Amino acid sequence: MAKRRQKKRTHAQLTPEQEQGIPKSMVIRVGQTSLANHSLNQLVKDFRQIMQPHTAIKLKERKSNKLKDFVVMCGPLGVTHLFMFTQSEKTGNVSLKIARTPQGPTVTFQVLDYSLGRDIKKFLKRPKSLNNDDVLNPPLLVLNGFSTSKRSGEDDQDVNVEKVIVSMFQNIFPPLNPARTSLNSIKRVFMINKDRETGEISMRHYFIDIREVEISRNLKRLYKAKNNLSKTVPNLHRKEDISSLILDHDLGAYTSESEIEDDAIVRVVDNQDVKAKHSQSLKSQRTPVEKKDNKEREKETEEEDVEMEEPKPSENLQPTPRKKAIKLTELGPRLTLKLVKIEEGICSGKVLHHEFVQKSSEEIKALEKRHAAKMRLKEQRKKEQEENIAKKKAVKDAKKQRKLERRKARAAEGGEGQGKDDAMSDDESSSSDSEHYGSVPEDLDSDLFSEVE
């Protein structure tokens, strides 16, 4: 299969500063119990669809991976948020921990119930599946039920907890600039609603479908019934006039859930229509300056151009708003959360707030002293470990140095021994030659070696 072509020439590339300002996330599972849960695995995959495109969509966890392994990689990869799904071995409760890297804090929620995306599609009449174009931009974040101002009957601690949660949710997606953001690029919405009475937080993920509305819904049903025989015609025997059918809003109760509601119809100004009207007005204002007779025009050559007047800008050109209907289709997953605690750091630090456990000031001071003693002991052990490592390294380096010196000494001794052996071999060869030629008599007749004539 051929690889799909990507736009490179006209696509706007982000600068390194802009890429650094975009928040990125990782959605992972931590713990042996959570890795063995198949439904939780599918929930993690569905939650990654929400966080697209700035998330690790194809991340695979191993049983040997620990939380520290992911935290270490957050810095080089530029990850700003960690979403950790865990499951307790004793109770089996599923928890969602949202941590801000690298300093924290970490907000822990208990997942009361959740529904997967495939379960939601079974109950929808017209389910929607996401394409690659639908996840090119992050979803629109909508927060409802959260208040950062102090109300009557609320403590300062509750207000601070609310501020931490709101700031945590607001920073998981890049901020929108109304002047630069195109409305057509926003195709998804992530809704987070808090119930003020129970304190439960519900998460929903929807797809935004915008359709143009030119006629009323009742007339559209009549047009569809004309072209499609399977569509049922509304019962008109109780209607006196056709206007009663058009103006009757109670007829909408008999339509399906997937159709667009009248309350969702808004008026939107489209810039493309303004540009089109402006171009049409310019064309209509263009008139020839020189009017010649037909005989003179026939004599002119084809190379001559007819001079045109400069068009005047139309003062009465105003954009006409169009009616557009907004329809939301749920994609999933659904989550219902309950706040448990807020702690410093990434899953290891001082507990700033706990929803179910309340400590007195004396208990808090005792815990702080115990924590300080643990930190001092940890630093002491760390220093001892570093000193031991340095000692072992020094011993190892000294051993290597002695080994190199022995090798050099052996090489030098081997060179001297080889020189002595060569001298002894030369003496032996010279003595053997003298002994061989010494047995030849001196008065040997020289005619034996004379040349033959």
Curated annotation (Swiss-Prot):
GO molecular function: rRNA binding
Record has Nucleus as a keyword: yes
Family matches, as PROSITE patterns: BRIX (PS50833)
Role: Required for biogenesis of the 60S ribosomal subunit.
Quaternary structure, from the entry: Part of a complex that includes BRX1, RPF1, RPF2 and SSF1 or SSF2.
SMART domains membership: Brix
Compositionally skewed regions (Basic and acidic residues) per UniProt: 288-300, 374-398, 410-423
Extra facts: Present with 8150 molecules/cell in log phase SD medium.
Residues in coiled coil: none
Positions of region (Disordered): 1-22, 275-324, 374-453
Entry GO CC: nucleolus; preribosome, large subunit precursor
InterPro entries per the UniProt record, alphabetical: Brix, PPAN-like
Protein name: Ribosome biogenesis protein SSF1
Sequence ranges of Basic residues compositional bias: 1-11, 399-409
Listed PANTHER family: PETER PAN-RELATED, SUPPRESSOR OF SWI4 1 HOMOLOG
Domain of life: Eukaryota
Localisation per UniProt entry: Nucleus, Nucleolus
Annotated positions of the Phosphothreonine modification: 301
Boundaries of every Brix domain copy: 26-348
A GO BP entry: maturation of LSU-rRNA from tricistronic rRNA transcript (SSU-rRNA, 5.8S rRNA, LSU-rRNA)
